[in-house]
């Protein structure tokens, strides 16, 4: 089966969630093969290790998908202006970013 580079989609926290003093960023990684990849979250370019949860890739239509979550407090979300989800798969790296200014 040919290799497939993942598609990466990054979702910001919802305004409803921010009202509860939480902020969850969701990085969806879809349509990749083989089913091994790593996710690195960054805040303003600095890797974040705390509050990261990544699901095990599962097979869907002969390819794999996984989701990674970055769990923050609303205050932490407001501390940085740019967040990114960097996915490394085989020799390819796909990075998606969002700036907080665009989400408010």
Swiss-Prot record:
Residues 6-99 form the Ig-like domain. GO terms for cellular component: IgG immunoglobulin complex. Disulfide bonds join 27-85. Pfam families: C1-set. InterPro entries: Ig-like_dom, Ig-like_dom_sf, Ig-like_fold, Ig/MHC_CS, Ig_C1-set, MHC/Immunoglobulin. One of its GO terms (molecular function) is antigen binding. SMART domains: IGc1. One of its GO terms (biological process) is immunoglobulin mediated immune response. The keyword Disulfide bond applies. Keywords: Disulfide bond, Immunoglobulin domain. This is Ig lambda-1 chain C region. It comes from Rattus norvegicus (Rat).
């Amino acid at each position: 089966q040919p290799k497939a580079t993942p598609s990466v989609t990054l979702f910001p926290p919802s305004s409803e969630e921010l009202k509860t003093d939480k902020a969850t960023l969701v990085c969806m990684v879809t349509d990749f093969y083989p089913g091994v990849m790593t996710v690195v979250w960054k805040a303003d370019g600095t890797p974040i290790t705390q509050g990261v949860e990544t699901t095990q890739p599962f097979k869907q239509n002969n390819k794999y998908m996984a989701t990674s979550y970055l769990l923050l407090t609303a205050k932490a979300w407001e501390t940085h202006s740019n967040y990114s989800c960097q996915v490394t798969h085989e020799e390819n790296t796909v990075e998606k970013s969002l700036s907080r200014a665009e989400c408010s």
